[in-house]
Every structure is written in C-alpha cells, then in structure tokens.
C-alpha cells in the first residue's frame, strides 16, 4: 500500500498551494509539529523551493525557526535572480542569431515558466534552443563559438552542443529525442516535423525582448514526453510535473482535447498520460474538469508514481538506493548500478514496455561512464 509521511503531506500541501495559489488544507498543517527543515529539504530535492515558498507565504502564520526563514529567503532570492539573468540573456541570444537569419524555437525552461502564477519562482535550468535545419544549426554553432564559451562540441549523433553565455548554459538542439518506448521513438520525429510545418509557432515576450515557442499542439506533447523520458531514464522532480500542469492549465481553454487524444494514442503514450493525469488531479491539486484524458481508474498508479517521484528527487539524484559512502570507486559504481536498475524495474508492472525499452540504454550509458 502506497503511503506518505506526515512531513511529505505537509510538503505536498505547500507545493500545491504555491502552484495553484490556494491556501493549504488546515487539517494537515494545524495542531501538528512541522519539521520545517525536512520540508524545505524535500523542496530542494524536488527543485520546487520557490513554489513551496509561495505556498508558505499564503499561510497566516508559521512557526518556522528564524535561521530557516533566512535560509529560505536567501534561496528564493537566488532563484529569482537566476531567472532574471536568464530572461535578460534570451533576447540577446535571439538578436545574435537573427543577425545570421536563424530564429530558433525555445523549448521548455523560461517558455513554460510564463505559465506559472509567479514565473520568477520557478527554478530555472538551461536555455534549450531547437534549430531543425542542418545548415542553420551549423551556422548557429559557429556563431556561438565566437560569442560564447563552449562546454560541449556539436555531436553528429545527437545534434547537440552546449555553451555558456553570461553565466547561462545554452544548449543547441538539431533534433528532439523521444526515447520512451518503441512506438514513440519510431513515430515522434516525423510527427514533430509535421507539427513545425503545419502548426503556428507562438511568439512571447521574455526579458524585454521576444522568444519563439513551439505551437501549443506540439508543446503539450513535447513537455510531457520530456518529463516521461527523464522519469523512465532515472527520475524527475515535481518541478517538471509543475511545468506540465501549468502548461495545461494556462491553455486549457485552447486545447483541442480530441486532437490531443489522437496524438498521444498515435505516439504510444496514452496510458502514461492517463497515469500522470490521475496523479495530477487526485494528489497534486489539478482541477479535474480541466485535465484532458483524466480517468479515475488510474488513481492508484498515479499515487505510486508520485511515491517514486518523492523517493528519487530531481532527475533521480537524491535516491538513496544509488548512493554509497564507500571510498572504493567500484563499490560506488556497483551501488549506483543496482540502485538505478531498481529504479527502472520498479515501473515494470505499470509500464512493462517502457521499462524493457529503457534497460539497454541505461546499461550502455553506465558502461560508458565507468572507468576500467
């Protein structure tokens, strides 16, 4: 039976309050000793400190120790500052690329942040720019080499390169990878290309300039595919789930639900969507009437997925099954291997196809990272 501790319940209530702007349930917060250090620790592991802080701000009063309050304030100010830095950099990057006739598509990140109640509270990551044209990405790569610090060179197999621009990590993508299951891997590239040809991209204001986002139809699928790819590949935090929920919520009136149903079915991710939809509605506060493809039959699976998310943390970095205090390198690698295999296999009874599909990739990646 899947259960949550009292501290986890408090954390989830504050997370929901921050994401949706609703006061947390008093029966969870009132009359109980709250381990604020543990709550904020969970928020850090899930990369949602800003959201939880927003939730705490809605409380009339808290008994949080003053040192923790100061630590929280400092962290939140850093999150906001990082967002402001990234928002200022994006228009500059667009202007650089526009000078050579390249207009990239901004994926995830600061684009989905626009859907939040408080965009600056979202913990930022990288600037991901998609440039599908082979010649254009080569030109953009050359320009970035001249104006940015290169972290990783362009690779022909993944068509990705990584740079640093004014303390902001910038990733160029010439291809969108969708390694979740065989159906998605086979169908997504052509479907994605069709979306860029047929659907209108969106232009948004960021940092006093502009950025181009994918069409809504594509973004709804891409953001979900991205989070499920990381879920099956190692783990995700509630930040990625908040990105997806806020995207759906902000645009629910414009979503063609029948078209979305056809898309996720064609791409082989219908069941995964329904499980995550049940998790969002039944445990994370998403309004039931605004969730596409919600089915209460998947509530137990949704609860189990939430349990896994809490156990693993952002990108799976905080899962204790992968950690070892041994000074021996090979003992640590063995612990990481068995722990990560356990994380992958835990999904087998819910998602057998995705579990089996992801094992070879994990083994290949693990061998590549191991020193012999």
Give, region by region, the residue ranges found by the protein language model.
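Conserved NTP-donor binding/palm subdomain of two-metal-ion nucleotidyltransferases/polymerases, i.e.
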Residues: 1-125, 131-372
């Amino acid at each position: 039976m899947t259960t949550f501790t009292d501290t986890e319940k408090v954390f989830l209530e504050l997370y929901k309050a921050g994401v949706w702007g609703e006061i947390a349930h008093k029966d969870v917060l009132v009359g109980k000793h709250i381990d604020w250090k543990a709550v904020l620790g969970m928020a850090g592991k899930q990369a949602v400190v800003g959201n939880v802080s927003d939730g705490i701000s809605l409380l009339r009063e808290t008994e949080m120790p003053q040192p923790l309050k100061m630590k929280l304030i400092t962290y939140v100010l850093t999150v906001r500052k990082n967002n402001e830095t990234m928002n200022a950099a994006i228009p500059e990057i667009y202007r650089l690329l526009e000078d050579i006739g390249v207009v990239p598509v901004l994926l995830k990140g600061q684009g989905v942040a626009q859907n939040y109640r408080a965009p600056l509270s979202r913990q930022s990551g990288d600037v991901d720019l998609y440039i599908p044209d082979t010649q254009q990405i080569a030109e953009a790569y050359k320009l970035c080499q001249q104006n940015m610090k290169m972290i990783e060179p362009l690779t022909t197999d993944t068509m990705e390169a990584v740079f640093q621009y004014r303390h902001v990590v910038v990733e160029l993508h010439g291809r969108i990878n969708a390694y979740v299951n065989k159906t998605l891997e086979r169908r997504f590239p052509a479907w994605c290309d069709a979306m860029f040809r047929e659907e209108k991209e969106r232009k948004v204001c960021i940092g006093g300039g502009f950025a181009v986002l994918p069409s809504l139809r594509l973004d709804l699928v891409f953001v979900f595919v991205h989070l499920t790819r990381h879920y099956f590949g190692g783990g995700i935090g509630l930040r990625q789930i908040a990105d997806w929920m806020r995207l759906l919520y902000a645009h629910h009136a414009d979503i063609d639900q029948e078209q979305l149903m056809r898309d996720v079915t064609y791409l082989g991710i219908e069941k995964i969507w329904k499980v995550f939809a049940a998790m969002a509605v039944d445990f994370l506060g998403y309004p039931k009437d605004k969730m596409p493809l919600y089915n209460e039959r998947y509530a137990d699976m949704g609860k189990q997925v939430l349990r896994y998310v809490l156990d693993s943390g952002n990108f799976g970095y905080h899962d204790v099954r992968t950690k070892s205090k041994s000074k021996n390198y090979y003992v640590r690698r063995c612990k990481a291997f068995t722990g990560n295999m356990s994380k992958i296999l835990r999904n087998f009874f819910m998602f057998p196809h995705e579990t089996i599909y992801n094992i070879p990739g994990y083994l290949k990646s693990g061998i590549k990272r191991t020193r012999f």
